């Protein structure tokens, strides 16, 4: 009895191992496994028929035996056809599986690239958030400084108003003092003139 080529066993084993690590395309892998079993069964049946046909040809040569040989040949031909079809189907499924695995690798690469992009964007977001926070704190500090300056200006304005009022009050008091002094000086001058009038009259 002949066995399947080693590359088929190794290929199927590698597919099953990959399926354990990453369970994708399970239907394709199962179909390949079933075809592998079918091919093995067909080859075993073909070998058994060949062996039985060879022994029958050695033991009998009558027409009945020849008819049996013809029937066995037809069965062998059918088995060969089935085997060829099974192998063709297996190759097509293996091709589909290869394409699916290639697509999976492409998607994995894209997923890894997307994850890298997301990490980069997250880093940028954290950096921008930190900058915005720092700028807000800076603006709050400047706003507080502006408020302090405004409060100081208000206080200085109030002090200036008080000083202006005091200045006006002092100016008014000075004006009153000057006015009273001038009035007093005028009264004293008039009194002196009145006192000196008799003296001027006697001299005349």
Curated annotation (Swiss-Prot):
- Please list where the region (Disordered) is annotated: 50-69
Where would you find this protein in the cell?
Preautophagosomal structure membrane
Task: Give the membrane topology.
Answer: Peripheral membrane protein
Tell me the domain of life. Eukaryota
Compositional bias of kind Low complexity:
51-69
What is one process in the GO biological process aspect for this record?
autophagy
Q: Name one GO cellular component term.
A: phagophore assembly site membrane
- Name the keywords, alphabetized: Autophagy, Coiled coil, Membrane, Protein transport, Transport
Please give the chief subcellular localization of this protein: membrane
Q: Which residues form a coiled coil?
A: 24-183
Assembly notes: Homodimer. Part of the ATG5-ATG12/ATG16 complex. Several units of each may be present in this complex.
Q: State its role.
A: Stabilizes the ATG5-ATG12 conjugate which is necessary for autophagy. The ATG5-ATG12/ATG16 complex is required for efficient promotion of ATG8-conjugation to phosphatidylethanolamine and ATG8 localization to the pre-autophagosomal structure (PAS). Also recruits ATG3 to the PAS. Involved in endoplasmic reticulum-specific autophagic process and is essential for the survival of cells subjected to severe ER stress.
Q: Which family does it belong to?
A: Belongs to the ATG16 family.
Report the protein name in the record. Answer: Autophagy protein 16
Species of provenance:
Pyricularia oryzae (strain 70-15 / ATCC MYA-4617 / FGSC 8958)
Highest classification ranks of the organism: Eukaryota, Fungi, Dikarya, Ascomycota, Pezizomycotina
